[in-house]
């Protein structure tokens, strides 16, 4: 609501409607009523590997159908399959590529990583109206202000990107001790 009030084209994407859209496409493509899509847990869609294997359907084909269906849904900017992530076949947008890759874990991540369009929020139904989320690929969602204040700390501004790995060395330097 805040982004809309500020004039940004934003909306909340309902995961129930998105998943209904995807399931419809999967059922039509593979001519089955079997539940090949197991669940959505932001930002991933998980597939039912056992059932896909039982039905003798290629897992990568299902990933592709799911990704293409997701990208046709209003508010979804990109969908990366686990196969594409493993092969390094990701979007040319280097910041997006790095964030998708850094979020991926072969044993825990889902089969399709969804990216909502900028200023849109892909809401998982279990969130029950919680106001925020983590893990988007857009830079404005990754800005976290870092402040250091205390005796002997002069006013300063750092304009380069900083991360958690910068905090400990900064504090160590202030304390005059060896950084971890």
For the regions a protein language model found, what residue spans apply to each?
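His/Asp/Glu-rich mid-to-C-terminal helical/loop segments that flank catalytic regions of hydrolases
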Residues: 148-166, 170
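Low-complexity, glycine/alanine/valine/leucine- and proline-rich hydrophobic stretches
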Residues: 120, 124-156
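A structural signal for short secondary-structure junctions
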Residues: 39, 105-108, 137-141, 163-165
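Secreted, luminal/periplasmic, and some membrane-associated catalytic domains
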Residues: 1-125
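Beta-strand elements within well-structured catalytic alpha/beta cores of enzymes
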Residues: 1, 114, 146-147, 167-172
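Second-shell loop/turn segments in exported
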Residues: 50-57, 132-134, 153-161
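Short, intrinsically disordered, charge-balanced linker/junction segments flanking boundaries
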Residues: 1, 176-180
